[in-house]
Amino acid sequence: MFNVFHSYLLKFDNNAKIVPDLAESFKVSEDGLTYTYTLKKGIKFSDGSPLTAEDVAFSYLTIRDNGAGQIDFKAIADAKALNETTVEFKLKRRDSSFVTRTAKLGIVPKKGYAAKDYRMNPIGSGPFKMVKYEPGQQLIVEPNPQYYGKKSQFKRITFLFLSNETALAHAQSGKLDVVMVQPEYAKEKVAGMHLVTLPTIDTRGFHLPTFAPKKIDGKEYGNPVTADIAVRKALNIGINRKEIVEHSLNGIGTPATALLHNMPWANPAAEFKDGRLEEAKKILKDAGWKLNKDGIREKNGTLCAFNMLGISSDMQRYDIAVGVAEQAKKLGIKITPKAYGWKQARTLTPTTPLCWGTGDYDPSGDLVGYFGSKGSINDARYSNPTVDKHIEEALDAKTNEEAYEIWKKVQWDGKTGPESENGDLPYLWIVTINHTYFVKDDLDIGKQLVHPHGHGWPVAFNLSEWKRK
């Protein structure tokens, strides 16, 4: 949604390449600590006020100080306007992902900005402006007459927030032009619409708590089963992900044994062959997990059994958990799938695996978040000093390109790491999903970039390019 209303210093084009947006150019100092962006002249916010370097500096310092969203700008020491069209960022330390992150933060006006009310009345410089927003119901937008880029041919666009079943029913009744559907509905027939299946970097997988139960600040953490590397490895190499995709996702998606694929910073050595059932059984047996009379493994009185969480508002994740549970049975591991709302599920993640969705064009977003010992989404509580060292080295590189080979070491450096079948395996990655939409036959949604994770919004990244055929 942010993309609809706001502009960025830089942006991703339809080929996922970083290109100018608000900024016409930028330069980086030799020591990698100063970034200077020169803005295009004459850009205005949707209310007609000029967008200046002061607004850019304000936007970055606000997110740095408030920690809003999931973009990490803690490395910024200062941001200031040198003049109306030049903004300078001083960093405390080098950050190779800084340029990429400047393609992720929308610019807001310094004057009159109020964080509490802003989502109900956003003032941006992007291709659209808000007409009406009813949380959980609908969002109505119209073209921003001040926008400096390609103008939409549509006078007004309405986004409806619907359940999967309701969305499909509305599509079948001819009330929608575009509707995202879960794979379980993708083989339905909808008159006047066609299925569009779009490739992504959007991966699904489960964190596996890496240590035995203990209390931290009075709260329970850890899991007695997934704490055993033998269980984590047996699950990773033993299950058949292709069968899970076929049975749980209608065959739509690509099996994934690692977090990253087909990206310049993805390490091919992190991937491995799965479906090695007998080898996985032997790993469990050798580790002391013996089958009981019910066909479930036990070790020192502990059943090889645990819950696995999906999300009640995203049944795709629950369906994946069901598929994993069916595969785990063959290993003598009892997994019980559960579905909760997101907030409740997050209260359970210190002890219980949850299905995560992720995929980012910023390498640090996923690799620091999931694998860094202080990562914001490292619910596996994975900690490896060598991995942390590689992360620091990658961030300290002068450019993203220089960092790519180091990011590969974060995943697996040949001796240690979270990924590869010989790694620590704090996650059980399952699939890189496809995003599936029914689209009206007379609507052209333009060239789509390979979608990142985004809960249905990535299809609208090029909304101003959509047109009737």
Where are each of the predicted segments found?
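Ligand/substrate-recognition segments at binding pockets and active sites
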Residues: W289-G359, H435
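Detector for C-terminal structural segments
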Residues: E134, P143, R204, N236-P268, ...
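Gly/Pro-rich hinge or "lid" segments in bacterial periplasmic/extracellular proteins
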Residues: D13, R101-S152, R156, T166, ...
